Amino acid sequence: RIIVITFTIEIIGAVLIFLSLKNTLFNGFFNGMFFAIFHSVSAFCNAGFSTLQNGLYETGFKFNYVLQLILIILLILGGLGFPILVNIMKYSKYYLTRKILGVKSWKKQYKPWVLSLNSRITLITTFSLLAIGTILFYITEYNNTLVEHHGIGKFVTALFGSASPRTAGFNTVDMATLTLPTVLITMF
């Protein structure tokens, strides 16, 4: 089950990353596909390795907000752990079939399909840290590393700046120019 979940998420992530890339960034289909597969696996496994010299802080990548959102999702899914993912999948299946579609089981047994306490604590903590980190990154870096981004790009880059240091270590901003408050927030 773990292998199926891992490969499914990584393959979907690789396809989405590949589709988010511009054709001019790589010399040929296979180089682009290798980049997509490598970064999907690296993000889901929370490794943070990149094949690019400056990480994702390269001209063709630091403004690719779709790529950043895909990597954020992979980072979060990989960081949650398999028991949480399985619990979420079971709950989602139950909620979709019973609550939304109204499908009733022919079996007359009661099974409480709820998110476990572990799942709830993990999800609440993960998204709370992500939200607080995004807001603080956005505020402290608005007139610094986020200056070159506009509109929704500032928010996505702040979200990426909050999600990545907790688990993987990808970067889409120049880490050497971060303000002191951002560095302190990132450390803790």
Q: Where are the model-predicted features located?
A:
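Membrane-proximal intracellular helices of multi-pass ion channels
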Residues: 1-188
